[in-house]
Amino acid sequence: DRVSKILNIKYPVIQAPMLGVTTPEMVAAVSNNGGLGSLPVGGLSAEKTLALIQRTKELTDKPFAVNLFAHPIPAVVDENEFNAMQDFLSQLCTTDGIQVEQQAVDKLRFYSYKDLISTLISENIKVVSFTFGVPDDESIEILKANQAILIGTATSAEEAKILDKKGMDMITVQGIEAGGHRGS
């Protein structure tokens, strides 16, 4: 079938990139059994991303995708809003006996998918998927110049049209029945 040929896999099965629960072992297991494993790295640092990719490569020589979050990174986090959110979460957690460590707003670090492009290139990643938005033109150009297959995520016909115009090679379509969050 067309999907299997494009992705160089045996079966047209793509494992969902589930940040927080997916491990290199899961990704490799899917890829080693003929599907396309997907390694989620949205919001992670380049160093952490590199370590996860290298661990996955230790476990498989088959194709796997790396999934990035393409949402905009906030320029400024309002300290009062951040503290109010932490106080609210602390109250909720205390009710259930869960310990919560407060974070200082000035210690927050947000990583953009743009911070990871050079890592993907250096590791010769050939399938890159995106969720929570559309990558910028420069990132698309760099990845395509390195023969990466790009997969976008759409939750509406309008989003699919935008992804198509941007040059995605494939588009994952999610409906309201998607498990967990939706990719927009």
Describe each region flagged by the PLM.
Residues 1-184:
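Active-site entrance/lid segments in N-terminal catalytic domains of soluble metabolic enzymes
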